[in-house]
Amino acid sequence: MCRYEHTIAITNRTLVQGDFLEQMKKVIHLHPHAVILREKDLPDDAYSALAEKILSLCEREGVRCFLHSRVLIARNLGCRRIHLSIPALETMSEAERFELQRNFEEISVSCHSLEDVNIAVKNGATQIILGTIFETDCKKGLKGKGIGFVEAICKTCPIPVYAIGGINLERLPQVRKAGAAGGCMMSGFMQLVKN
């Protein structure tokens, strides 16, 4: 059993010391459940070039890769997995949501409440990224919603839930016990030093 099989690696190249692609090779080689290529600050052309490389690395290792919000880039690159925010999903027309479900086999959605989860599920989400569970350096001062929140959502959610926010390998068993399929890690993967 892989130590990282219940984790999703969320990218943030600004946290990486050294070469981002080399770091991603290490991360992908660990076989997490998936990678979400975040990099929200990149312009489309740079994101597309990076996505092509990450998709290739993931494909070679048999790891799922979700592109973050860039629906057209994902379609152009033949990527059938997309990650969206609730606001992005809600602002889509009915026709756009239909196309989304037609063009993507997996749709991941960030949620912060039961209402968000219901919207995501109704609109074809296949997995939920639920946060923020524990306080984290990425969102200093934002109090985590805790394990009880994970448990409450997982009791009613018909699709896999992955917790985010302060998740590490030590906390992973807690969120799994609460009903989550796993957890998302950003700094844990971006600052990983071993091979």
Task: Write out the residue ranges for each language-model feature.
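Active-site mouth loops of central-metabolism enzymes
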Residues: 3-21, 105-111
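Conserved, mostly hydrophobic/aromatic
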Residues: 9, 27, 35, 74, ...
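Glycine-rich phosphate-binding active-site loops on the catalytic face of alpha/beta enzymes
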Residues: 9-13, 82-95, 127-141, 167-195
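Structural preference for beta-strand elements that scaffold enzyme active sites
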Residues: 6-8, 33-36, 64-66, 80-83, ...
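Alpha-helix-loop-beta-strand connector modules within alpha/beta enzyme cores
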Residues: 48-67, 94-113, 143-168
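Histidine/lysine/aspartate-rich catalytic loop segments that bind and position anionic ligands
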Residues: 107-135
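Short, acidic/polar
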Residues: 14-28, 69-72, 112-119, 168-173
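Structural motif
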Residues: 30, 77, 123, 156, ...
